[in-house]
């Protein structure tokens, strides 16, 4: 288990002290995939680096596996850090070493013998799907394969926790999905706790059990991923989820929708369905009852934490009174309705 207690981090700036983190409190159970999301500059990377004390917090405590890392002497802290692996956006591989030797590096530094190194590294290469590339150099493999080397290297010391700091942000969408699938498999097969930093809500949706939303160094929302997607409370969370919708709309359509919103001639709605509501004709029933025009802009059906989850972005038009009645009816049917004021 990871516990962050009253964590604050201040850095000196050109005009005074800057609060990168402010009174952060989080509890992450063993074996969970926990996401931390926020805009650029929200404090995500600072937060994840406090977990292994790469960045020592100005105030507060970091408890990992029952030990308060902030109280440990240097030698004990080095030992504790061996139980915390980390992967980064940049792969940080040594170009003069093969795939095998890059993965073996932490074990060599720990003084392991060659036989022990081979016994540890070969299964890891098999786990990440790189057995056939073990004798290649970083320049001879793809970006996704380089990140797999980074993951295997982070697992070499048999950590209980894996920290991922924007590990997929430099990868293409298909490679990102394959890396996230690998992280889920590692979590499932090794029982590893994974803390994943990202600015992409799609990444959170694909792999995480729970999520915390960070803004200006503060946790503004936290909960199960399915709950946060269905009913986001904070404006930052709503904007991040709205980005998932907006990114799917062609630029010309975004412009037309934005113009209609300015003139007040339409209502941009996000409708979220879960469970049995996904395959029910709720929308068509609403149109018939209240004589509305629904222009479907974007829709998808996905699965989050084993539950069917449907999301629609629609532009609704009709008499104002009937629009209000229709939204009330949708909510009565268990549909989560959010009226969006803009599309970027």
UniProtKB/Swiss-Prot annotation:
GO MF annotations in UniProt: ABC-type D-methionine transporter activity; ATP binding; ATP hydrolysis activity
SUPFAM superfamilies the UniProt entry points to: ACT-like, P-loop containing nucleoside triphosphate hydrolases
Annotated keywords: Amino-acid transport, ATP-binding, Cell inner membrane, Cell membrane, Membrane, Nucleotide-binding, Translocase, Transport
InterPro entries documented for this protein: AAA+_ATPase, ABC_transporter-like_ATP-bd, ABC_transporter-like_CS, ACT-like_dom_sf, MetN_ABC, MetN_ABC_transporter-like, NIL_domain, P-loop_NTPase
Purpose: Part of the ABC transporter complex MetNIQ involved in methionine import. Responsible for energy coupling to the transport system.
Family membership noted in the UniProt record: Belongs to the ABC transporter superfamily. Methionine importer (TC 3.A.1.24) family.
Protein name per the record: Methionine import ATP-binding protein MetN 1
Annotated organism of origin: Burkholderia ambifaria (strain ATCC BAA-244 / DSM 16087 / CCUG 44356 / LMG 19182 / AMMD)
């Amino acid at each position: 288990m990871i516990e962050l207690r009253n964590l604050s981090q201040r850095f000196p700036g050109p005009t005074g002290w800057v609060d990168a983190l402010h009174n952060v409190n989080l509890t992450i159970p063993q074996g969970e995939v926990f996401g931390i999301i926020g805009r650029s500059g929200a404090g995500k990377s600072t937060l994840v680096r406090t977990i292994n004390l790469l960045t020592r917090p100005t105030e507060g405590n970091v408890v990992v596996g029952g030990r308060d890392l902030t109280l440990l002497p240097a030698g004990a802290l080095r030992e504790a850090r061996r139980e915390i692996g980390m992967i980064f956006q940049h792969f940080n591989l040594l170009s003069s070493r093969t795939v095998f030797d890059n993965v073996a590096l932490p074990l060599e530094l720990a003084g392991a013998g060659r036989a022990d190194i081979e016994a540890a590294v070969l299964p890891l290469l098999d786990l990440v799907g790189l057995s056939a590339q073990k004798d290649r150099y970083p320049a001879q493999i793809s970006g996704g394969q380089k990140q797999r080397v980074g993951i295997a290297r982070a697992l070499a010391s048999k950590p209980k926790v894996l920290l991922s700091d924007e590990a997929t942000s430099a990868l293409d969408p298909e490679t990102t999905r394959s890396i996230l699938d690998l992280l889920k498999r590692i979590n499932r097969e090794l029982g590893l706790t994974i803390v994943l930093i990202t600015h992409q809500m799609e990444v959170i949706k694909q792999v995480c059990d729970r999520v915390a939303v960070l803004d200006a160094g503060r946790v503004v929302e936290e909960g199960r991923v399915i709950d946060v997607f269905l009913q986001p409370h904070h404006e930052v969370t709503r904007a991040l989820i709205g980005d998932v919708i907006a990114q799917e709309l062609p630029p010309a359509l975004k412009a037309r929708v934005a113009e209609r919103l300015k003139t007040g001639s339409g209502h941009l709605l996000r409708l979220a369905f879960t469970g049995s509501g996904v395959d029910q004709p709720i929308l068509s029933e609403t149109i018939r009852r209240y004589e509305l025009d629904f222009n479907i802009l974007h829709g998808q059906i996905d699965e989050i934490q084993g539950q069917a989850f449907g999301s629609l972005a629609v532009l609704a038009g009709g008499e104002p009174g009937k629009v209000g009645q229709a939204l009330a009816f949708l909510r009565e049917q268990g549909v989560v309705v959010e009226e969006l004021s803009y599309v970027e």
